[in-house]
């Protein structure tokens, strides 16, 4: 047998997958244009130590390291704590930030609950102050938008305030009847309020003592006859518990909302763009999230359980002033924010408000302009009197004061007294006489807002609002797949949203920095 010689030469470096190679410096492996370096550039400019609370017990992981890992995870839209734990074992960037530590998901959970919660707003402010200084952010212009985000609550766990009020009224009526029966049977009178559950509880105890003193036997189990006193006694106990439940539900709803979720009491049921039943208008538990942007960065965050954006504008702007000690010069928002209070607030704080009002777009349609019966299209004489399409005059009737607004608001009520003989009455009004409510101050504020919105600067600002404010929600919801809140309770939800916005701003800083480098 002839010997065969293999002349195939290999020019590949010997590869042994388990061979240790030096140096073990992960910073040499990470790309110099990686977002981690931009992240460290911002975070290292902040004194994170002052946000760390001291604690007793064994020394845990380095809190600065933990905070960096969590912020970097949210910057890369990694929200699951188990996913963060896995990243610390497999991703060299997280391994570099951890410095060979391997925190568990519970360690991250404890750190978020004990250290970040309560400090998230201050950390967000510090990060934004550094970014504004480095990127020279134009904070004079502020774009505002709001959205409803689904809460981490069961979809059928609703509690309605009106239902609780109706049930409470029925329960009070039954309690009054039951106490009346017990008074006749035991001669023990009740003089307190029927809404006082503690007093009713004391009355129940007195009934029980009366039964013990008079040797009234309580039948237990099925098939045993109960005395009238026992039946009324047990009925009153059930009704008192029902009354407590109704009062707790009404108190949980408060004065500003009409519903809440049993799973998350801070979540409110509201309409959203998408629901579980093919957009049939089913309510879902959620939170109202308000964001304000300047130069593509999120400048302010607010979470509330309000169902509309109108009432959130003033507290949102107050929180902005508290955060940065100044108000923006220009505020741009959509029609959800145009109201009497918001216009007056902008006037008071010397803010140029580009706030759309409710019918801003509809006023430009042909249908609106052709509707001669709308109060906006009625003729107005020099002396201020209104003239209907038939030439009939409206007479000033009275002033109506709106007590629900934050600023004094007086509406003029005008009435046409000759509508009975008008041939066009059916097309004009269904009432006996046509009444028109006019607020001259609000009309003046709307006219000023329309002038701003229709100007060239207003058109450009409205376009930028669509790009920046609505675009931010588009990135967070669609690109980052964050369309449902993970935690429960207002404080936890605020903490989570602050982390999301900090991660967004850190990634936006890196992206804008790369644009400047590569341009």
Q: Could you tell me what each predicted segment is?
A:
Residues 1-36:
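Hydrophobic alpha-helical membrane-insertion signals
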Residues 25, 29, 38, 43-47, ...:
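Short, solvent-exposed coil/turn linker segments
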Residues 8, 53-57, 457-460:
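A ubiquitous short alpha-helical element
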Residues 29-71:
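Basic, short loop/linker segments at the boundary and entry of helix-turn-helix/winged-helix-like folds
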Residues 31, 57-65, 76, 80, ...:
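Generic, well-ordered alpha-helical segments
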């Amino acid at each position: 047998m002839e010997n065969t010689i293999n002349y195939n030469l290999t020019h590949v470096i010997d590869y042994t997958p388990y061979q240790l190679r030096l140096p073990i410096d992960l910073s040499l492996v990470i790309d110099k244009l990686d977002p981690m370096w931009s992240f460290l550039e911002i975070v290292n400019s902040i004194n994170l130590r002052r946000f760390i609370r001291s604690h007793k017990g064994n020394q845990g992981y380095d809190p600065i390291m933990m905070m960096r890992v969590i912020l970097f995870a949210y910057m890369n839209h990694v929200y699951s704590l188990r996913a963060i734990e896995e990243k610390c074992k497999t991703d060299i960037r997280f391994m570099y930030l951890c410095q060979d530590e391997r925190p568990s998901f519970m360690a991250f959970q404890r750190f978020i609950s004990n250290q970040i919660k309560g400090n998230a707003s201050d950390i967000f402010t510090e990060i934004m102050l550094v970014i504004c200084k480095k990127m020279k952010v134009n904070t004079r212009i502020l774009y505002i938008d709001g959205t409803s985000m689904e809460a981490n609550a069961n979809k059928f766990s609703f509690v309605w305030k009106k239902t609780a009020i109706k049930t409470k009224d029925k329960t009070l009526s039954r309690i009054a009847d039951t106490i009346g029966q017990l008074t006749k049977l035991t001669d023990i009178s009740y003089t307190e309020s029927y809404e006082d559950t503690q007093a009713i509880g004391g009355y129940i105890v007195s009934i029980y003592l009366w039964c013990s003193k008079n040797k009234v036997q309580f039948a237990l189990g099925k098939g045993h006859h109960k005395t009238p006193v026992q039946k009324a006694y047990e009925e009153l106990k059930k009704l008192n518990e029902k009354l407590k439940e109704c009062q707790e539900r009404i108190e949980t709803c408060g004065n500003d909302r009409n519903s809440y979720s049993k799973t998350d009491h801070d979540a409110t049921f509201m309409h959203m763009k998408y629901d579980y039943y093919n957009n049939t208008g089913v309510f879902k538990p959620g939170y109202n999230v308000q964001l304000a942007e300047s130069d593509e960065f999120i400048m302010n965050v607010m979470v509330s359980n309000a169902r509309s954006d109108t009432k959130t504008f003033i507290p949102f702007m107050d929180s902005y002033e508290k955060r940065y000690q100044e108000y923006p010069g220009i505020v741009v928002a959509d029609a959800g924010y145009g109201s009497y209070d918001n216009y007056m607030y902008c006037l008071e704080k010397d803010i140029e408000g580009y706030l759309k009002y409710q019918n801003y777009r509809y006023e430009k349609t042909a249908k609106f302009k052709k509707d001669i019966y709308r109060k906006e299209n009625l003729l107005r004489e020099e002396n201020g009197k209104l003239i209907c399409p038939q030439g009939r005059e409206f007479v000033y009737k009275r002033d109506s004061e709106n007590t629900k607004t934050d600023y004094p608001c007086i509406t003029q009520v005008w009435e046409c007294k000759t509508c009975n003989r008008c041939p066009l009455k059916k097309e004009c009004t269904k009432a006996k006489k046509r009444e028109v409510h006019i607020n001259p101050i609000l009309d003046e504020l709307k006219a000023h807002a329309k002038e701003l919105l229709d100007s060239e600067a207003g058109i450009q600002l409205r376009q930028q609002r669509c790009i920046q404010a609505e675009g931010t929600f588009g990135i967070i919801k669609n690109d980052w797949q964050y369309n449902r809140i993970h935690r429960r309770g207002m404080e936890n939800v605020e903490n989570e949203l602050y982390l999301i916005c900090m991660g967004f701003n850190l990634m936006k800083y890196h992206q804008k920095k790369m644009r400047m480098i590569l341009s």
